[in-house]
From Swiss-Prot:
SUPFAM superfamilies hit by this protein: IpsF-like
Alphabetical list of HAMAP family matching this protein: IspF
The EC number(s) this enzyme carries: 4.6.1.12
UniProt protein name: 2-C-methyl-D-erythritol 2,4-cyclodiphosphate synthase
Cofactor note: Binds 1 divalent metal cation per subunit.
UniProt catalytic activity: 4-CDP-2-C-methyl-D-erythritol 2-phosphate = 2-C-methyl-D-erythritol 2,4-cyclic diphosphate + CMP
Protein keywords: Isoprene biosynthesis, Lyase, Metal-binding
Family: Belongs to the IspF family.
């Protein structure tokens, strides 16, 4: 068994869509990023890669590459899952926390959970996602951006 942890944060300011956990969230601003800015999936990818000792998302999908400009993070997650399988790993379970002052995310968490559990090949009871605020403290509390943490347990396939 191996544990992986991932973190990502992005600043608001894009005129694009706000995508979190593969779900479009109605909001006046998107997140500034080379890809689609999905901090939830980026944190999850880092947790998966870290648990397998395969580096991080920046190494596999560099922001200097035109190939990943405006990339759909769900496709990046799929590529990470293929890489894990090639290295003999499968996901046992996962837990995530999104930290955002705005927008309120509770109505969108079930869709994110379903989307990500499916992408990981997990039943819903093995994947959790929740959201919190920083009680108006720091850059997140000032509504400057959104962050996410992910923890996964990986199993080595026999």
């Amino acid at each position: 068994m191996r544990i992986g942890h991932g973190f990502d944060a992005h600043r608001f300011g894009s005129t694009g869509k706000l995508i979190l956990g593969g779900v479009e969230i109605p909001h006046e601003q998107g997140l500034i990023a080379h890809s689609d800015g999905d901090v939830v999936i980026h944190a999850l990818c880092d947790a998966l890669l870290g648990g397998a000792a395969l580096g991080d998302i920046g190494r596999h999908f560099p922001d200097t590459s035109a190939e990943f400009k405006n990339a759909d993070s769900q496709k990046l997650l799929h590529r990470v899952m293929v890489l894990l399988k090639e290295h003999g790993f499968k996901v046992s379970n996962g837990d995530m926390t999104i930290i955002a002052q705005i927008p309120k995310l509770a109505p969108y968490l079930p869709a994110m959970r379903e989307t990500l559990a499916l992408a990981l090949g997990l039943p819903l009871q093995r994947f959790n996602i929740k959201a919190t605020t920083t009680e108006r403290m720091g850059y997140i509390g000032r509504a400057e951006g959104i962050a996410a943490h992910a923890v996964v347990l990986l199993l080595e396939e026999q």
